[in-house]
């Protein structure tokens, strides 16, 4: 079993602009939105790997490569996220995804990728499930052929995981205990039956395939206590936790919880001609340094 074989990495996901990389460097893996211009080499020397978020079976019109996707490959729409669902069955699709989505990011220095929307073909009114899954497998196999050493985190894709041994670094799933209802725009507790089903899927991935499992849950950003409690429940189940807000725009709680270390000190410049002789510096420097 994976959990017994090695220590699981600490993982964080942050999708908005201006990710606080200096704070997130305590995690082993940080998934970011690569279009926001991050340097993937920024934290590698410090032991933190930036993974690029990529959407496999959905694409938003704002993506640069959207205009190059043939109309006949567009099989449905996801109204909640204003995205188009991409058919995975065309023979040219794996090369398209490798060339136009992953290759530019690889050239920038990314070596890890978070593959999202693996089961979005189910949003279409008609689809051949086996053919769609075969297409997803071809995408991942093509990535390994084109980019030796690539590291992939797959969001769901439980059915194809046994066919991808050695090619998937981690399998993720959202909403184990707490989720975000995009249609109703609210945070919700996951129903027991759904939770039990998802736990069974993740445990199978870990025990049968030896792939670590990451559970991503969503809690209102002001409710830190609930986020902390949820992360502990996920970790107690044997999975890597990440609990954050619905927009993935805050530093959440995972295997690690970041402790704030920045203090704003206000002082009166008329007290002293030099900052190091001001009262806040004289009386606060030592205890603040002691606190880290």
Q: Could you say what each language-model-derived stretch is?
A:
Residues 95-126:
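Active-site groove signature of glycoside hydrolases
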Residues 26-32, 81-94, 126-130, 185-191, ...:
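The substrate-binding groove and active-site-proximal loops of carbohydrate-active enzymes
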Residues 52, 115, 169:
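Conserved, mostly hydrophobic/aromatic
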Residues 58-100:
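Active-site-adjacent "subsite" loops/lids of carbohydrate-active enzymes
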Residues 253-292:
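Aromatic-Pro/Gly-enriched surface loop or interdomain linker
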Residues 7-22, 154, 285-292:
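A short, well-structured beta->alpha microelement
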Residues 2-19, 174-176, 180-257, 280:
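C-terminal active-site rim and adjoining tail of enzyme catalytic domains
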Residues 136-162, 173, 210-220:
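Aromatic-lined carbohydrate-recognition surfaces of secreted/lumenal glycan-active proteins
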